[in-house]
Amino acid sequence: MDYRESTGESQSKYKGIRRRKWGKWVSEIRVPGTRDRLWLGSFSTAEGAAVAHDVAFFCLHQPDSLESLNFPHLLNPSLVSRTSPRSIQQAASNAGMAIDAGIVHSTSVNSGCGDTTTYYENGADQVEPLNISVYDYLGGHDHV
């Protein structure tokens, strides 16, 4: 019997992620119009993997509605992304890792695709700025 069977977690409640048999959560997404996939990373929590998927999905697809996302309240639908798949991959991975690092609750959040600052409340009831802007990770590179 594996971990998922013993805990009753054979399937995730979040879209775009899966659990490895050793317990890590992973996420990847297809690049529209290609057969390519972007590996978004391996995460300690399902929420971290799901946020990474949301950021990448939003940046790649620019959906009219955020209802298809795992955490629709975390992204601002008015932002537009004009970034490369590699930069989207980096922003998504960093957003997921930030969630894994102990970020618990969002108080005012924008997409990881735009040039915005995001505020999260951590487990110590403090509000700290967390910038998950893709442009910060690029250092001025890979803009489309």
From Swiss-Prot:
Which cellular components does GO assign to this protein?
Answer: cytoplasm; nucleus
Where does the UniProt annotation locate this protein? Nucleus
Answer yes or no on keyword Ribosomal protein: no
Q: Is the keyword Transcription in the record?
A: yes
DNA-binding region(s), chain positions? 13-72
**Biological processes, Gene Ontology terms:** cellular response to water deprivation; ethylene-activated signaling pathway; response to fungus
* Record's keyword terms, sorted: Activator, DNA-binding, Ethylene signaling pathway, Nucleus, Transcription, Transcription regulation
Named from the GO MF annotations, one term is: DNA-binding transcription factor activity
Q: Which PANTHER family match?
A: ETHYLENE-RESPONSIVE TRANSCRIPTION FACTOR ERF019, ETHYLENE-RESPONSIVE TRANSCRIPTION FACTOR ERF042-RELATED
Give the record's family classification: Belongs to the AP2/ERF transcription factor family. ERF subfamily.
Q: Describe the task this protein carries out.
A: Probably acts as a transcriptional activator. Binds to the GCC-box pathogenesis-related promoter element. May be involved in the regulation of gene expression by stress factors and by components of stress signal transduction pathways.
Q: What is this protein called?
A: Ethylene-responsive transcription factor ERF019
This chain's source organism reads Arabidopsis thaliana
